[in-house]
Amino acid sequence: MKTNKTSKFKSLIGPLWIGLCAAFFLTNCRSDIVYSQFSPISYSDGAMSSSDKWHMDSVVRFDYTIEDAQPDYQLLMYVRHTERYPYQNMWLFVEDSLRSDTIEFYLADDRGQWLGNKHHGFIEMPVLLESNYHYPDTGHYSLSIRHGMRDSLLRGITDVGVEIIRNGKE
């Protein structure tokens, strides 16, 4: 009687493949994200309301807790915008519990092509604020962001987000 080596091999590959995929996802997709939050931008002056206009006096604030001060962290900011955003770059004033900074970054290249991730009519631009940020202690922290552009009412910005990621392995 002749055995079919191919069918035995195929019957072993299925469970082996599933096991390898599960092991990969359990070890490599462990979340080191400590905080991730988006805040929608909206403007209202009583007569007019808009969900994609950011007033220069409007501050977006994120409050979060650091439970482990040992590792360093990555601080990322995200700006979501539409094609209505009129400029190539953007200036932001960023303040956290420990310091403040003025940041310039580009949303479009020299040819006017949007940078970042495009999906569903929005463009999401990640901006690395810090790659090895060390918190002095555990506790509550805050991060505030407001735009520093010349327009008092900046159109095309829909959301601002912050993500804090623990560096390294435990």
Indicate residue ranges for each PLM-predicted region.
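Short beta-strand-plus-loop segments that form exposed binding edges in beta-rich domains
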Residues: Y78-R80, I145-D151
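An anionic, turn-rich surface loop/hairpin at beta-sheet edges
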Residues: I103-H134
